[in-house]
Amino acid sequence: MSTEHRRSRHRTTEAEPSPQDLEAQQEHRRLERRTLLKQALGLGGACAAAGWLSLAPAEWPLSLRDPDGERGKPKPRLRSLPAGGFAVPDVPSVADLAVAHGTKHKEMLKGALDALGGIGRFIKKGDVVVIKPNVAFERPAALGATTNPEVLVALIELVREAGAREVRVADNPIESPESCFVRSGIQAATQAAGARLYLPAPNEFSMLGTPGATWIERWPFFWGPFEGANKVIGVSPIKDHNLCRASMTTKNWYGLLGGRRNQFHQDIHGIIADLALMLRPTFVVLDATRVLFRSGPTGGNLGDVKPGNTLVVSRDSLAADAYGWDQLLERKGEALPAYFEKSAARQLGQPDWRKLSLRELSVG
């Protein structure tokens, strides 16, 4: 059989495609063309959109522009303090305000705390306690601008004897922190009493939320020492202040703020009222062993300081401050600084200390 004959025979045995098969093949080709066209258009649109977004203003939500590199940084975690602060429950049968006079600081402090129900009311075994002194300036304690280190030692010892697992001392001074802690004697006192000192390194700060605050609803806060803490005590000197008229236990919390806090001087009473809202302590100690009665808050002259030989202890910082204003700065009859009214309007304390239960004692 010839080759040509075999080819002819083979062609006649192949099945011819049906009209339905031909139509299906054509439809498949049309779908493929449409799919390719859509993909091409989609890719072109995405490229065009990306090009446009790369040119859109940086503040636009979908803009791809990031001239400062901020978009790639993680958002800071917003911290919060306990809703009820660090306060302990009320005990109706004890004093609200205790005033101890004398020169033996530990005995004075213990006596004042006993009048409020005893140190055991405030500090339990296993507590982690933050103590906030005022170490704002590079001054020796004798000038009255910073917390008396002897009072701090007495306070740390009482807290540790009550069973605290850890005691932390922290402040963010206005002047050089290292120099302030050394010159004031607070560093040596902290170490001698067995507490841990926190210096305000940048990584110790976090953004804190304070709902309802006027100035610091979201503000950098000295968070490091507060991590895991469940009790907070403020211990601050009593002193004249050229802006807010007096710096005492409520103003003391200013030393926990970071950022550009000097801007708050434009509304000093407003920021102090915010501080009262921000932090509600376990108790406060108004250190009036010395009284800086003029040239505050920095002082600098022994002639501006007088002996006070007094410690005021309360859960209510407004009450402690108001007592200090009237009786220790001896400004009774003068109107209280405006932060008292602003804080009281938020129900953050009682500036009329005479309405509270007061216990006064002399020790040594």
Task: Go through each PLM region and give its residues.
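Extended, low-polarity segments enriched in aliphatic/aromatic residues
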Residues: 50-143, 147-171, 175-364
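A periodicity- and composition-biased signal for non-globular, repetitive helical segments
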Residues: 13-17, 39, 138, 257
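N-terminal export signals
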Residues: 18, 29, 35-58
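N-terminal secretory signal peptides
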Residues: 1-31
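Hydrophobic alpha-helical segments, especially transmembrane helices
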Residues: 34-35, 39-40, 133, 252
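Small/flexible residues
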Residues: 7-13, 31-35, 134, 170, ...
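Short alpha-helical segments used as structural interaction elements across diverse proteins
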Residues: 30-31, 35-36, 129, 248
